[in-house]
Amino acid sequence: MFDIGWSELLVIGVVALVVVGPKDLPEMFRTLGRVTAKARNMAREFQRAMEAAADETGVKDVVKDVKNVTSPRSMGLDAMKQAADRFEKWDPMKPQQGAPKPAAPASSIPAAKAQQGAGAAAVTAPPASEPAAPVPQAPAAAAPEAASPAPAEPKSNA
C-alpha cells in the first residue's frame, strides 16, 4: 500500500528508537498496531455498508442488465463472426456436403395424398409445374361432322 522497503523500515525504526527511547518503544508499536487494526476495520465496515446500500437500490441488477445488453452475443456479433468465418472457409468450387435436395412442388404433394387416401390406383395427376394441355370436347351430335375433313382454304396470290 505504501510501498515501503526494508531499508526505509530500518531507517524509521532507528529514528523511532532515538526519538522515543528504548523504554517506551514497545508501547508505541502496540498503540500503532491497534490504530492500524481499527482503521482497517472501519474501512471494511464502510465497504460492507456501501455494498449493502448498492444491493438495496438495485445497482447490481442494473449492472447485470447493462452487461447482458452490451454482450457480443446479445448484439448478434457472435453470429456475425461465425457467418464471416464460414464465408471465409467457403469454396464455391467444392460441392456442399449437406446440400438439401430440391423439394417437390407444394401443389403436387396434396394431390398425391388425396389419391392415396381415396385408394385410387389409376392415373396420377401431372405436377403443377407442367400445365396439362386442354382437351377440346365436342358435343355428341357434332361428332360425325368432326370426322369429315375440313374444306381447304383457297390460296390468294398477293
Curated annotation (Swiss-Prot):
A Gene Ontology term for the protein's cellular component: TAT protein transport complex
Record keyword Transferase present: no
Subunit structure: The Tat system comprises two distinct complexes: a TatABC complex, containing multiple copies of TatA, TatB and TatC subunits, and a separate TatA complex, containing only TatA subunits. Substrates initially bind to the TatABC complex, which probably triggers association of the separate TatA complex to form the active translocon.
Skewed-composition ranges (Low complexity): 94-132, 138-158
Lineage per the UniProt record: Bacteria, Pseudomonadati, Pseudomonadota, Alphaproteobacteria, Rhodobacterales
TM segment ranges: 1-21
InterPro entries: TatA/B/E, TatB
Region Disordered: start-end pairs: 73-158
Membrane topology qualifier: Single-pass membrane protein
GO molecular function, one term: protein transmembrane transporter activity
Protein's UniProt keywords contain Transmembrane: yes
Location in the cell: Cell inner membrane
Biased composition (Basic and acidic residues): 83-92
Protein name: Sec-independent protein translocase protein TatB
Family statement drawn from the similarity comment of this UniProt entry: Belongs to the TatB family.
Record key words, sorted: Cell inner membrane, Cell membrane, Membrane, Protein transport, Translocation, Transmembrane, Transmembrane helix, Transport
Role: Part of the twin-arginine translocation (Tat) system that transports large folded proteins containing a characteristic twin-arginine motif in their signal peptide across membranes. Together with TatC, TatB is part of a receptor directly interacting with Tat signal peptides. TatB may form an oligomeric binding site that transiently accommodates folded Tat precursor proteins before their translocation.
GO biological process, alphabetically ordered: protein transport by the Tat complex
Species per Swiss-Prot/TrEMBL record: Cereibacter sphaeroides (strain ATCC 17023 / DSM 158 / JCM 6121 / CCUG 31486 / LMG 2827 / NBRC 12203 / NCIMB 8253 / ATH 2.4.1.) (Rhodobacter sphaeroides)
